[in-house]
């Protein structure tokens, strides 16, 4: 897939590149295009805690980065949660306001907002999890090296040559994906498909009739293999 240049209009508020499966995207090309079009970037690093692109941690490559702490992620908070990072003070204040119902001061609300405050117990769990993040990510990299050594045809999705993936998912791509998954199931080996139904195929968007053949082909051929740090 790629960015449709003809689809860029004044209605576009931001470009959101995704570091999918924990693998950094080709951020320089996104940044170059965004700067040319004067469009801000919001990084989706929800699957990429600790991933690196050109010696910088993802989530810090643009003004705003977003992380998820959902229980299946490389780092969690003992429940659902998330984090937004920014190096811009004005943006930081807006985010703090929006997460607290649009609050400006104790008794003033100057924008619409939401209740998205992370409680202190979840935050404390997250701080402990953070200490172990690098070690767990290293274990994921050990696991993928074993897969690569034992699987043929380079079927594991490649790592960005300018980055360091944290392998939130270890994903193979193969035309016979469904046959492979059936064989794994028959041998009591778990697997998963992300994402079987793409955004433009969801009922909420299907009326627009988008056709994205590259994304659709990719979706038909990818399969996530077991990849958690305690895998033996």
What residues fall within each predicted segment?
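Active-site phosphate-binding strand-loop segment of PLP-dependent enzymes
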Residues: 1-77, 83-85
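PLP-dependent aminotransferase class I/II
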Residues: 2-7, 14-18, 23, 27-29, ...
């Amino acid at each position: 897939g790629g960015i449709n240049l003809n689809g860029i209009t004044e209605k576009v508020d931001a470009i959101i590149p995704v570091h999918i499966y924990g693998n950094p995207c080709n951020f320089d090309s996104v940044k170059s295009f965004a700067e040319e079009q004067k469009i801000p970037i919001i990084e989706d690093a929800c699957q990429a805690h600790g991933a690196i692109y050109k010696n910088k941690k993802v989530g810090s490559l643009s003004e705003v980065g977003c992380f998820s702490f959902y229980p299946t992620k490389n780092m969690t908070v003992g429940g659902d949660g998330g984090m937004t990072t920014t190096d811009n003070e004005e943006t930081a204040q807006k985010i703090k306001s929006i997460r607290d119902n649009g609050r400006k001061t104790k008794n003033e609300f100057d924008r619409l907002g939401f209740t998205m405050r992370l409680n202190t117990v979840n935050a404390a769990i997250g701080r402990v999890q953070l200490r172990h993040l690098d070690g767990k990510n290293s274990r994921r990299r050990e696991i993928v090296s074993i897969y690569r050594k034992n699987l043929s045809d380079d079927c594991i999705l490649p790592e960005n040559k300018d980055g360091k993936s944290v392998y939130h998912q270890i994903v193979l791509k193969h035309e016979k994906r469904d046959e492979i998954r059936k064989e794994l199931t028959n041998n009591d080996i778990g697997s998963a498909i992300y994402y079987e139904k793409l955004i433009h195929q969801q009922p909420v968007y299907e009326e627009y009739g988008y056709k994205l053949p590259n994304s659709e082909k990719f979706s038909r051929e990818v399969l996530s293999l077991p990849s958690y740090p305690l895998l033996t």
